[in-house]
């Protein structure tokens, strides 16, 4: 398999993996081995184009059992072209038209908007490369907004003051996922498709790569520095947790109990800044690692169906998480293991995804509503407030505060856009 075809096959798998739960579970179209691509397609002028170009490395399951809006289909074709699909403009337009007509969007939960005292302003920027699928955003102290261009295989940056954007192509297969900056301003990422951790020297534009010492650690996910400058990271499907010493380049990998099936995912530190806490995507657990002994302690969450995408930590060292499987927002007490849950505004199918904490308020996005909804929860009053994301959101997979504490950086993967949600002063109009 060529490098390009391998990349396309990984993309196809990831596209199917992030379909809404109802689309994954309630499969309507059954395989048919007699059909090109393994699944039947409706008749249409571009049917053969789809069969010829969308089955190079995978079958058509991701298409026939998907749930996409016209805008989603447009961006899907852009992403595939960005990754190297061999189709010209005319063919791409024909494929988009066929997919939109043949596979209309199915019903999704409607976002519930709750009024409240906080006012926000949404700003957004498109990535220079169409179909880049920015996975994670990063707001740096100098005011820049960075993103991981997963399908474009680059790291990008925009200046919110001027709108000027720049992309830094990664010279090897990377599929960048999570991003974090160090004290010198370098940008580090998890090479989700390249089994490495990468570092971009912003001053020179040069990359340095740290390959995983075990080939099973194929998909580094979320990186985060501790207070001592050690980079910790999760390896989702490989089932590892890892840490990298930037001074020596040494990487230590270890399997938490039950991995790889549990799939380590989100990663956070409490106020001590040394002991990492992480969630599993494959089970209903939160775990922590003793940084001195590497002993892992796990906490089983009350609902066996709980699945966590992202987490946030408030100043009282409470861990908050959105339960992707049931639409709830929950608080986890690391000292006792106690959990308290709140029903999210848009209900059990809303699929909370990106999450962060700003001034001890929890902000997250309901990713399965159309459009996506931005939600704010005040732990003091135990009240929600929510807004529609004007551009639609396109699944906001991660978010973080801006350096001044007055905004939230977001990535809108399905739209190939990044944005900042400005939290306005209380006296603003």
Regions found by a protein language model. Name each.
Residues 24-49:
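Electrostatic cytochrome c docking/interface patches
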Residues 83-111, 143, 408:
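C-terminal capping alpha-helices of c-type cytochrome domains
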Residues 123-154:
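Beta-strand-rich domains and repeat architectures in extracellular enzymes and scaffolds
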Residues 130-141, 172-184, 215-228, 259-274, ...:
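Beta-rich, blade/repeat-based domains predominating
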Residues 145-151, 187-193, 231-237, 276-282, ...:
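Conserved beta-strand positions in repeat-built beta-propeller and related beta-rich domains
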Residues 159-163, 201-205, 245-249, 290-294, ...:
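Short loop/turn segments that connect beta-strands within beta-propeller blades
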């Amino acid at each position: 398999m060529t490098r390009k075809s391998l990349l396309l096959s990984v993309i196809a798998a990831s596209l199917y993996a992030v379909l809404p739960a109802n689309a994954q579970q309630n499969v309507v179209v059954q395989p048919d081995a007699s059909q090109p691509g393994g699944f039947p397609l409706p008749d249409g002028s571009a049917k053969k184009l789809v069969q010829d170009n969308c089955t190079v490395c995978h079958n058509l399951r991701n298409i026939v059992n998907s749930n996409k809006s016209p805008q989603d289909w447009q961006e899907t074709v852009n992403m595939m072209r960005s990754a190297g699909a061999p189709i010209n403009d005319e063919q791409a337009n024909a494929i988009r038209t066929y997919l939109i007509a043949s596979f209309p969007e199915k019903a999704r939960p409607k976002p519930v908007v709750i009024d409240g005292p906080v006012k926000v302003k949404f700003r957004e920027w498109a990535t220079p490369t169409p179909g880049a699928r920015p996975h994670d955003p990063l707001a740096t102290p100098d005011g820049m907004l960075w993103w991981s261009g997963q399908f474009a295989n680059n790291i990008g940056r925009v200046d919110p003051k001027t709108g000027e954007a720049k992309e830094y192509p990664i010279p090897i297969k990377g599929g960048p996922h999570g991003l974090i900056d160090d004290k010198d301003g370098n940008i580090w990422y998890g090479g989700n498709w390249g089994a490495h951790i990468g570092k971009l020297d912003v001053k020179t534009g040069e990359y340095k790569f740290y390959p995983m010492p075990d080939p099973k650690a194929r998909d580094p996910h979320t990186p985060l520095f501790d207070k001592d400058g050690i980079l910790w990271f999760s390896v989702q499907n490989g089932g590892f947790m890892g840490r990298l010493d930037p001074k020596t380049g040494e990487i230590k990998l270890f399997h938490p109990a039950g991995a790889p099936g549990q799939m380590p995912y989100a990663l956070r530190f409490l106020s001590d800044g040394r002991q990492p806490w992480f969630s599993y995507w494959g089970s209903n657990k939160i775990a922590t690692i003793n940084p001195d002994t590497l002993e892992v302690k796990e906490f089983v969450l009350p609902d066996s169906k709980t699945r966590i995408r992202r987490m946030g930590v408030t100043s009282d060292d409470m861990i908050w998480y959105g339960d992707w499987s049931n639409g709830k927002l929950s608080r986890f007490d690391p000292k006792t293991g106690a959990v308290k849950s709140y029903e999210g505004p848009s209900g059990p199918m809303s699929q909370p995804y990106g999450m962060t904490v700003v001034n001890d308020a929890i902000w997250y996005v309901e990713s399965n509503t159309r459009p996506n909804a931005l939600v704010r929860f005040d732990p003091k009053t135990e009240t929600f407030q929510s807004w529609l994301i004007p551009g639609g959101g396109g699944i906001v997979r991660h978010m973080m505060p801006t350096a001044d504490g007055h905004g939230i950086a977001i990535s809108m993967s399905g739209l190939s856009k990044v944005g900042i949600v400005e939290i306005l002063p209380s006296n603003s109009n």
